[in-house]
Amino acid sequence: MKKYKFLFAISIIAIGLMTVLLASINEKKEEKENLLSVPKIEKWETKNEEFRKFYPREFDSWKQTKNSDQIDDMLKLHPEMVVLWAGYAFSKDYNAPRGHFYAIDDVSNSLRTGAPTDKESGPLPSACWTCKSPDVPRIMHEQGNNEYFTGKWAKYGADIVNPIGCVDCHNPETMELQVGRSYLNDALKAEGKSPTLATATQQDMRTLVCAQCHVEYYFKKTPLENGKTAMAVTLPWANGTTVEDMEKYYDTIEFSDWVHQVSKTPMIKAQHPEYETWKTGAHGRNNVSCADCHMPYTQEGGIKYTDHKIGNPLENMDKTCMNCHRVSEKSLLANIQDKKARKDDLNQKAMEQIVAAHLEAGKAWEVGATPEEMKDILTDIRHAQWRWDFAAASHSAFFHAPEETLKTLGTAIEKAGNARIKLAKVLAKHGVTDYKAPTITDKKQAQELIGLPMGKLIEEKKQFTNGLLKDWKNEAEQKGLYNPKSREGVETKTSY
């Protein structure tokens, strides 16, 4: 009797397990059918969560960029940057980039975007939204590039509300890779050496979708027929994409982002030239794409998908580096750390030299130096800081192109040194032989040195975030552009 009870129990358990297995198989089959079916997604659907039904793994891995939430205050880490950017918004607030999930939060909370009180106020143009959201190519399509690039940043506060996501890189109707920002193709044509969107292969596109944003750019003042002026995002590639090529481009058109508050130098602010830096390194020369390393393929059961947790490839070395490199992870990491240490050393020396040049130039103006005496000096400072910033703003430059990065920082130090030698002669000519530029010790001291009213700026920003910013979100929700549930549990973090 006991034997039959035992067999009966075993049979029940077996039937149960078979039921679970069959249910799992059916679920996987249904999921595969969903994945292979034609997505029922509108062409300009910019709410990223709407893609989860058809692409759950891709969406869930993208959402993991939410975990990259730490604020790393770069001005606190490198207070010299405050003086390097004196007179420019970056001296107020500059943090290391966080995950794509926070793109809208970070630009909205930054002191750089100021504290607008309506759609027509604030310090920055609408172009400052360009790389933050899939809502941008939607608006470009609806209104045209000229209209989009016209007006203040606050103009689109209630329209650009979803962080970097699906439509930035994919056509929702086919899920093919796409570039929705036309200035990239314009620049590729102007450069004349790289594949354009018309000739790009699938492998090329796995980099070009990233190059929509991870590039050097400037805002080109473009007068329009209606009397308005567009501040159009433009990539300075007409001469090529090296640091020297772009320096020549900017010098030829006599462009400057701002005039330095202390040295009176017409400055160029490098943005984030990862694509240009990548091109000069081993990975770029061998067409190893951005996605190959930052979005590796992942296998889950019978389903292979691209990991959309865009971040540091070193966190997934078995799926990234070790696919090609036949050395141990330990050896590879040691090599990378050595490259970073060398870059960090030259980076610090470059900052110190350029800061001293700015302050010594300020002293020269103070004691009566003439524009003619200062002309070549200011050119040296301009070129030194452009080259330093090019290497520093591309956060991964030491990895993507270590030799090029060290060369760039080396020439930055050289040019800053040349400026200081000339400044010593100018200062001596005007009776100053013992001036020593103050040492920059911390962020607070540096911001006080250049006269930034930080308390006032922070208070104004808090009024904006507690007022107009909330109004934008409410308006966007009413328009159907924004789902507040997508931001539940998100903590506001800043460096101030």
Swiss-Prot record:
Heme c 5 binds at H283, C321, C324, H325. Substrate binds at Y217, H272. Its EC number is 1.7.2.2. It holds the Pfam family Cytochrom_C552. It catalyses: 6 Fe(III)-[cytochrome c] + NH4(+) + 2 H2O = 6 Fe(II)-[cytochrome c] + nitrite + 8 H(+). It is an enzyme of class 1 (oxidoreductase). Heme binds at C128, C131, K132. Its main location: periplasm. This is Cytochrome c-552. The lineage of its organism: Bacteria, Pseudomonadati, Campylobacterota, Epsilonproteobacteria, Campylobacterales. The gene is nrfA.
